[in-house]
Curated annotation (Swiss-Prot):
Complex and partners: Monomer and homodimer.
Keywords: Activator, Cytoplasm, DNA-binding, GTP-binding, Nucleotide-binding, Phosphoprotein, Repressor, Transcription, Transcription regulation
Function: DNA-binding global transcriptional regulator which is involved in the adaptive response to starvation and acts by directly or indirectly controlling the expression of numerous genes in response to nutrient availability. During rapid exponential growth, CodY is highly active and represses genes whose products allow adaptation to nutrient depletion.
Annotated source species: Bacillus anthracis
Family annotation (NCBIfam families): codY_Gpos, PRK04158.1
This protein's name: Global transcriptional regulator CodY
Length: 259
């Protein structure tokens, strides 16, 4: 397959995504096919975002690593020493993707490391490995193009996470601000009693202990539930089951108490 055809194959994957998140596993599969190498997309912390195997490596440690989708911490950190594409590293290199305990089996193993950079920061690493055949310029062009695409996708995901976090925080703040003074007091006592993100409590007992009416507790819970911050369900005589749905809620509630 010529370079242009291989590039088009990668482009076809991006176009088929049509604005949706690119699946790192599919991306790895396509890279594996066009570059004809084992492909590992590794995050900054060593998480295996995606991988595809062209040549099986029979090694228990490698199998466990793939099953756990996590690269060793020491190896992951060492990858940051590589700031530009390093190709055709042999099995004696500290950066080899082949198991060092089986060097004699993978004497012809070659590894190429491509930094994934976006927004001026290191986002991860693309690791390619194959036996025998050297990585040529065409392979490196495809690898660097792929790393750019992966970098853009990681940046997009990070931006979405930040946006979602801000939205969750805003929802919580609005829900809390909708509570009256007595309702807020009731909620503080409820979650002191709950001491976690979910559990069972008896509203009447809290009302009696704090000196507020049960209706205040019911109204407060209803407001938080309608905002999607919590889920509550009456279990009759047993009490009320409460579960926090928004992970920003308890943090914002704690901030109010310290102010």
């Amino acid at each position: 397959m010529e370079l242009l055809a291989k590039t088009r194959k990668l482009n076809a994957l991006l176009q088929s995504a049509a604005g949706k998140p690119v699946n790192f596993r599919e991306m790895s599969d396509t890279m594996c096919e066009v570059i004809e190498a084992n492909v590992f997309v590794v995050s900054r912390r060593g998480k295996l975002l995606g991988y595809a195997i062209h040549q099986q490596i029979e090694n228990e440690r490698m199998k466990q690593m793939l099953a756990e989708r996590q690269f060793p911490e020491e190896y992951t950190q060492s990858l940051f020493n590589i700031t530009e594409t390093s190709s055709n590293l042999d099995v004696n290199s500290a950066y080899t993707a082949f198991p060092v305990e089986n060097k004699e089996l993978f004497g012809q193993g070659l590894t190429t490391i491509v930094p994934i950079v976006g927004g001026g920061e290191r986002l991860g690493t693309l690791v390619l490995a194959r036996l025998g055949q050297e990585f040529l310029d065409d392979d490196l062009i495809l690898a660097e193009y792929s790393s750019t695409v992966v970098g853009m996708e990681i940046l997009r995901e990070k931006a979405e996470e930040i946006e979602e976090e801000a939205r969750s925080k805003a929802v919580v703040q609005m829900a809390i601000s909708s509570l009256s003074y007595s309702e807020l007091e009731a909620i503080e006592h409820i979650f002191e009693e709950l001491n976690g993100t979910e559990g069972l409590l008896v509203a009447s007992k809290i009302a009696d202990r704090v000196g507020i009416t049960r209706s205040v507790i019911v109204n407060a819970l209803r407001k938080l539930e309608s905002a999607g911050v919590i889920e509550s369900r009456s279990l009759g005589m047993k009490g009320t089951y409460i579960k926090v749905l928004n992970d920003k809620f308890l943090h914002e509630l704690a901030k109010l108490k310290t102010n």
